[in-house]
A protein has these predicted regions:
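Glycine-rich helix-loop "coupling/hinge" segments at transmembrane-helix boundaries
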Residues: 136-169, 203, 439-476, 481-482, ...
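Transmembrane alpha-helices
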Residues: 107-141, 174, 178, 190, ...
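Short cytoplasmic-facing helical segments at TM-TM junctions of multi-pass membrane proteins
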Residues: 84-123, 127, 387-428, 463
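Generic hydrophobic transmembrane alpha-helix motif, especially the helices
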Residues: 36-76, 343-380
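C-terminal transmembrane helix and the adjacent membrane-cytosol boundary/short C-terminal tail
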Residues: 25, 173-249, 332-334, 472-508
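Periplasmic/extracellular loop-to-transmembrane helix junction in inner-membrane transport proteins
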Residues: 1-8, 165, 243-316, 331
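Transmembrane-helix boundary motif in ABC transporter permease subunits
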Residues: 5-35, 312-342, 355
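Transmembrane-helix bundle segments that line or gate the permeation/cavity pathway
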Residues: 72, 76-92, 98, 119-211, ...
Length: 508
């Protein structure tokens, strides 16, 4: 239930803020850096402060902890889903937009009947990959350290925390089985039917979808009275949402309010930027007063070490899983086989595997510093793989036919056809992987298995240690340092890549 509520809030957030970012440049200049920034903020940074907020909001009630867990699921899904929806809204083919305008669609109908529909396949795929981050967040949020004690909610997360503390390997295996069962049920009852249904929204020849099989639950709904009743209900809701509400809106003359407000765009832009600057100055001053100053001299070295591990993990993930994702995505049969397997592996929290790595390191006297790189990859590689598969699946059939006509092979096939076609999805994948990488770095640089603790020097280790000790000022300093690294990545890496993806690699 916590997972589903978090997913619902993530979808609502994605639609609202993706549309605002795609439509209004002043908002886009703030929303995109903010979302990229928040995506890479470590989960413990949210939990440290949101836990206190929700506990004070609902004193003497378990509702505060429930809200913390739901918000943790939200932070694991919302940023990735919003970025995907924004990306697809920006690359809607011009001929489709011109066709919608020729049918005299109003802006409301144009969004829901064209732009949102065009974005649904990619959004659904990223909702599936975001599921892994959501489970990671949910597991972490069901057992939260507060000071010298741990507050737990009933659930798989608290069960895993107890199993790790007791070094109980069978209990960890039971938790893996329970998570796998949940993921398989979601795949069979929700995601597979939705993937099959939304295949009709891909921008290509309808004959390209014939290779897709019909999942058993999709067939059950399609040929049942329940499915027919559900279809009638959805059609009635669509008629209300797409036609009756816009007619009421225009009948009441509410559209004139937007025209009136548009006349003062310069004023709203000025007030918006002024508000953003004042908020940044105020929060920056409060944080500076809150930070412990004795750690400043050591932060650059810690930041450099953790950044090197994260960068190495991300580059290896792209180099290894881009070819693998292309191989899977080109074959619908392989997608059908590997999709549930990848979902199960992706949704299993990486820290479950860390005790096995810790045992290996202890036995063979290895250095945790280098071993942290493959451990970080466990939390990043699935983002790249899912986005590459989504990108390959979304390539229009016409583009594929052109590449076959020119006889592209091997290196030329990658350079002139495949990599340009999936480049926007690779960009989304590595940005999403960055968020998972920073979270994984915190968990990977300090491993605890019962009474045994292994650690590597780095910013992630500092954040993990001070958070477990309940030192909020030190935790805030570590999270702020990690956020500074993220901000540098946004300015010098992610934004240039976004511009290239939007201008050079777009279907027109």
């Amino acid at each position: 239930m916590r997972f589903l509520l978090g997913m619902a809030w993530s979808l609502l957030f994605s639609v609202v803020f993706a549309v605002l970012a795609a439509r209004y440049a002043p908002l886009r200049r703030v929303i995109l850096p903010f979302v990229n920034f928040m995506e890479s903020v470590p989960l413990v940074g949210f939990l440290t402060f949101t836990t206190v907020y929700f506990l004070n909001l609902y004193p003497h009630s378990v509702m505060g902890l429930e809200c913390t867990a739901i918000f943790a699921v939200f932070t694991g899904q919302a940023w990735n889903m919003m970025l995907t929806l924004y990306q697809t809204l920006r690359i809607v083919p011009k001929e489709l937009d011109e066709a919608a305008r020729s049918f005299n669609y109003n802006p409301w109908q144009r969004f829901w009947r064209l732009e949102f529909i065009y974005s649904v396949p990619g959004l659904l795929w990223n909702a599936m990959v975001s599921q892994s981050a959501a489970w990671f967040a949910l597991v972490a949020s069901e057992a939260i350290p507060i000071g010298d004690r741990s507050v737990e909610l009933p659930g798989v997360g608290s069960y895993i925390a107890e199993a790790l503390a007791q070094q109980n390997v069978p209990a960890i295996l039971y938790a893996i089985v329970a998570l796998a069962a949940n993921i398989v049920l979601l795949d069979q009852l929700v995601f597979r039917p939705l993937v099959r249904y939304t295949a009709r929204f891909k921008y290509e020849d309808v004959t390209a979808n014939r290779a897709l099989g019909n999942p058993w639950f999709y067939n059950s709904l399609a040929f049942s009275h329940v499915g027919a009743a559900l279809g009638r209900t959805l059609r009635a809701l669509a008629d209300l949402w797409l036609f009756k509400l816009p007619r009421l809106w225009y009948a009441l003359g509410l559209h004139r309010l937007f025209r009136l407000a548009a006349k003062g765009n310069w004023l709203w832009r000025s007030l918006w930027y002024l508000g953003v600057v004042l908020a940044c100055v105020w929060f920056g001053y409060r944080l500076w007063e809150y930070f412990p100053k004795q750690y400043f001299a050591m932060l650059p070295e810690w930041m450099l070490l953790t950044t090197a591990r994260v960068a190495a993990a991300m580059l290896l993930s792209v180099a290894i899983f881009t070819p693998l994702g292309v191989w899977i995505g080109l074959n619908p049969r392989l997608v059908k086989i590997f999709q549930p397997i990848i979902q199960i592996l992706a949704a299993i929290p990486p820290n479950i595997f860390y005790p096995l790595i810790a045992a290996f390191i202890a036995i063979y006297h290895q250095d945790l510093g280098w071993w942290a790189i493959p451990m970080i990859m466990l939390g990043t590689q699935w983002y790249v793989l899912f986005n590459v598969i989504a990108g390959v699946s979304a390539i229009p059939t016409q583009i594929t036919e052109v590449s076959e006509t020119f006889g592209l092979r091997r290196f030329r096939w990658w350079r002139y056809y495949m990599l340009p076609a999936i480049f926007p999805y690779i960009v989304t994948g590595i940005i999403s992987a960055a968020g998972g990488a920073w979270n994984s770095a915190i968990a990977a640089e300090v491993i605890q298995w019962g009474s045994t603790t292994l650690s590597a020097t780095g910013l992630g280790a500092f954040i993990s240690v001070v958070t477990d000790a309940g030192k909020n000022p030190e935790s805030a300093l570590g999270c702020a340092a990690m956020c500074a690294l993220v901000a540098l990545c946004i300015i010098f890496v992610w934004q240039p890549l976004y511009r290239i993806a939007e201008t050079k690699f777009k279907y027109d």
